């Protein structure tokens, strides 16, 4: 074999592997989440994640076919790409929404997929009524050069649809990132206002994912307007976006399977606690309530209870959890979680100084923390030091 031909085959193989990697990562998580749903029972958030990964699989299958110039498969996979390219970010938002919003709100957000469905139908319809010559011209020449204005007839119409899809994509990305970040922030604040132990409940990692996806989204918009064809000439141009998105999607799937607490659990616990709450008398001010909260929490050392909730404090005061949470926020100036954990850290420091023989595990447990990780994280947060350096 001629060295030049061998080098070309090597490049083609590398292109195929790299361009298909994100597709296989997403397909892997579709299978894993489906098995999890079957054996562990249905979970709304994971179902939405599975649908997101399925859409992403179609998206990267379209990329793979395009970048490897599989011309005969282009009409089918380009139609799927037209849909999935505009459905991926809305589906990710639906996944975030399923973890942070009620079922009734989630039903309304399905309309966010409307642009993807409309564009997908239009593109597939145009391919269906195109002549073989027009399809060949569009697939082999116009779509790779992205010179949509040079086409005629249906090729020109397809070009306008493609350009409109790019505009819609950019709008979707910005909308999803802003709305998704707000959803996560609002949800985390609700968790902090209700629970002292927020480990495994807050969506901290997902907030970071939104920041990372912001950077990727900017790259996506740039790639979208530059044209996919620019990344198919060399394995090196495919490698960076392929490995980046493959890694992010794999990490997202891994973390998501470990996230067991969602809005469904929160709403259920709220409903159970609401049944034993009583209303605060109108004559008691927030300042007066804040003083009573401080007294009962300090005197009875309620902060030492594992998994203590704002409803537990409300029950001790014979009042409503909403009033307790509001009084802590407005009068004490912190969230319920920070209020309790600050007291736990102060108590832990006393234990460390009066009982130097105690292990950190014992100190964490006796201070009310449900895990070592939570203890170390809060200790560092409130003191700026690790437990071993507190006296330095």
Stretches with model-predicted labels:
Residues 2-141, 167:
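N-terminal low-complexity or simple alpha-helical regulatory segments
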Residues 11-21, 129-140, 146-179, 235-238:
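Extracellular-loop-to-transmembrane junctions of the mid-late helices
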Residues 27, 31, 58, 89-93, ...:
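Alpha-helical transmembrane segments of polytopic integral membrane proteins
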Residues 39-59, 113-114, 159-225, 238-244:
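Alpha-helical transmembrane segments of multi-pass integral membrane proteins
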Residues 136-137, 189-193, 262-270:
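Short, Lys/Arg-enriched, Gly/Pro-containing loop segments at transmembrane-helix junctions
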Residues 213-281, 292-295:
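C-terminal transmembrane-bundle signature of multipass membrane proteins
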Residues 254-366, 378-381, 385-392:
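Membrane-proximal linker segments that couple transmembrane helices to downstream signaling/catalytic modules
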Residues 321, 371-373:
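The DNA-contacting recognition helix of HTH DNA-binding domains
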